[in-house]
Amino acid sequence: MMLAADKQVDFAISLAGMIVSGAEPLVEQNRIALTDTGLPEETVNEYCRLLASAFDACKDGKPLPSADNSDLPEALKRNYQAVMAQLQTPYLSRFIAVDVRPLLPQITCPVLALNGTKDIQVNYETNLEALRNGLSGNTADVIQEVEGVNHIFQHCTTGAVAEYKEIEETISPEVLSAIITWISNLK
């Protein structure tokens, strides 16, 4: 998408693309994982608020908030400290800062964007909606969800990463067909 905004490509294909800032899916992934462990909703919400605050502070170059005075269980406080250590790495600090949305109006080439409805790594609704709202409206744009597939476009039951290795399908045939058809229609 960034190259498309710089007018360096004839078309762009986004597969399970993250359009919103990296912080948003990380908070959501944590929310899902913690909820799945059976933690109380209040604890999950408190942890996710703290995590979002830390990501915002990192993006703004401010000190990271501490979990010491929170009511979080000790295991979550340790987990939070591990995440704070990772935030010191160039990759993660850049990942949470990247937000493609401001570039979308500059993209004039055709865009095909596909996201799976069972993708728990990149929320399809949030990211496809950001594309719909931000792109300049090229008539060749196709922005759609693919029903029943995970982040790597396999038909799945839950979308959990642990499920990937159990699925024989490499990539959904409908996804490959959609890509081929879309490119063929660009002529």
Predicted regions and their residues:
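Conserved hydrolase catalytic core segment
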Residues: 1-13, 20
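Short helix-capping segments at alpha-helix termini
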Residues: 7-8, 135-140
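Hydrophobic/aromatic beta-strand patches that form the interior of the parallel beta-sheet core
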Residues: 11-13, 112-114, 144
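Accessory cap/linker subdomain of secreted extracellular hydrolases
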Residues: 13-105
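Short beta-strand/loop motif that positions the catalytic acidic residue
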Residues: 107, 113-115, 119
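Acidic beta-to-alpha connecting loop that harbors the catalytic carboxylate
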Residues: 117-120, 147-150
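Conserved alpha/beta-hydrolase "acid-adjacent" motif
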Residues: 120-129
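Catalytic active-site module of serine/aspartate enzymes centered on a nucleophile-bearing elbow/loop
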Residues: 138, 142, 149-153, 157-187
